[in-house]
Each structure stands twice: as C-alpha cells, then as structure tokens.
C-alpha cells in the first residue's frame, strides 16, 4: 500500500526534551477541545477555563478504566457516530466491557505509531499477525501497520481454532514469513511446535528477520532466550487497546515512549503525586485522538520512565514496563512478581532447556514447576531454588517435570477439524458437532 506520510510528527523533528515539550503543548489545546465534546469530559471540564498547558492538565482528576466501563458504550464519544471506523473492547477480566473507538483519522496515527520499528516494514515482508482480532485492537493494529508499508499480512489470529500451532509453524516455514507480531510466550511455543515438527527454529526459517512482541512484561533474560532460539532480534512494543502503541524499541534495545504523539506522566498511587519520570503508574494523554479523547488516562501499569540520553538519537523518554501492581503475591514477608521470577527462570543455562514454567505463591512457600529434561532436572531444581532464596529470601519448592506436562504435545501438533455448520449427518458420522461448529 505504501501510503504517503501524514502531517503528524515524525521521528527526528525535535531536538531534546524542551523541543518535545513544546511540540506536546502546541497540540494539547486541540486535544482538550476534542475531549470537551464528549459527554464524560463535558461534565468534568470547565468550559470557561479549559487546560492549555501540561501544568493545567495536571490539575484534572485521572481518567480510570472504571470511568471507561461506567461510560460504556458511547459516553466517551467526541465525534458523530457516523465518523467512527472501528469499535473495540479490551481483554481485561473485570467482567465489564472497556470500550474504545476510533475514526479513520485516528487510525492513521495508530498505524504510524505501531510501524515505527527500527528494523523496518516493507513491501518485501511477509508479516504474520498472531494476536487476537475480534473486538481487541492488537491484531487489527498490526495488520493496518503492515499494509501501510505494503507488507503481505498473514492474519494468523491466536484465538482461532483455524490457526493451531502446527499451522503457524507450517505457514512460517512454507511462506517464508519475515516478521511476526505476538506475545512473547507465543514465540516460545512456536519454537516447541517447530521442534515437534522436525524443524530447527534457529536455522530452518531463513527468511525470518525479527519477532515483534508485546502484550506481556518481558524481561531481558526471556528476550535473550527467545532471540537465541530463533536466531533473530526480538523487538518489543508496548501499548493497549484503549491507546494503541505507546512505545517502541530503538536499534539500541531501549523502549521509547512516543512522546511526540502523547503526553506521559508517572503517578505514585501512594502519595497521589505525578512527575515526568521515575517509577510509578503510567498516565497517558493521547494528543491526536478525535473519536475518544483521553485526558490523563491511568493505565495502571507499573513502569520506570527516564529522560536520559540514548545513542539512537530519537530524543524520546525510555520506559521499562514492570507489570501490574495487582500481579504481585506475598510469600512470607516478600512480594513475588512474575517479572522478577521470570528473570530467574530464564537465567538458568540454555542447556537445561527450561522455557515453560508456572509458580504458585503460598503463605510460606513459593512452589515452582518447570519443564526440564531428566538429565538436567536435579541441577535446574537446585539452582533455581538457590536463586529464589537469594532474590526473595523465601523458601521454595522447585519441581522438574517432563516435557509435555505444562504444554501438552498434542497442543503443538494437532490440526483441529474446523467445519461449517451442518444439521444432516450419515449413520457413522459424529453429529455432536451439529450447529455448534468447531
């Protein structure tokens, strides 16, 4: 497709933080004006004194996920409905829908932000999109970004019976997939499925250039393991259904916030204070969103933000995503987080072949199960238990399991029979699948 560039800000159009802040404030007045058109913000804002600077904006209450749920479906809508291009809902587990919607103009911004990959996306690429489509944004977003630059998109989904892991591996191998988009865990499962199919991930997929990943916190240790398994760079992306892409990785491996397209704050929920950098929860104000403007939207993701220099020259703040505060669990007096525990698991020697694991935090003990070949089981159990003790000062029970225990072999190799709905069956056919086709 290779559409001409839009008039939105592009990388390299500013020099340093001051230029960046000036760019943000130049757009902020328009952003607030758009927001004032929605029923939610019309009630929250003082029409006679709309915020015009970042300092003014900081006086407004945070917008929360609950605000979005309470205003389902269109209480946040700031344009006529006929201007909407798509409607989405996030994948949260709160039980209430969290809506998001975008105009065609919003989609230009969305696709451009996602496509800011240092390795590039071009018409020569075959791009496997292996995240959900349906009501979620993620699959549609990657698809749009790929087409924006002319890539051939393979819409793999990852919540479809029509695309089991065996088919993912076949498509990657036979089509010569060059780029993929998925959660990091998928890349590990593909490697296992490829091995089960008789392939060597690092050598039998020569067209593969990079793995784009996002959707879960990713430690350096797991990233390095995935990269070694496949022999290509792992390039991280960070965002949400409510906002689209918020950060991407530069050639030097650092994750940068797209602060030319959004205004970011770091919120300390203990004190209620906000600042431009440091550790806390990420608060975002997208600057170029018409359909559903968000002012000071709290993503509730724990992050660390800094404005230190980076050799890439993008002059954008860097971010480390630490996950959700609610994802930590107590064992004794220690708080165990998946991020810290993952770093320990993937710091085990590659020779142990530990990539699949799970853990349960109990009152006095951390129970961990890992898939590991029998010849490495005792060493892996002992080393991981020692690492947990050193990192958290808690007792742990590490159990090595045979391959196929946590990720069953049939999940890697099965090809489900996906059929259209039928009502009439022959005498020897299974009519249990009538109407409910699966």
List each language-model region with its residue ranges.
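Glycine-rich beta-strand-to-loop/alpha-helix junction loops that act as flexible
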Residues: 213-216, 356
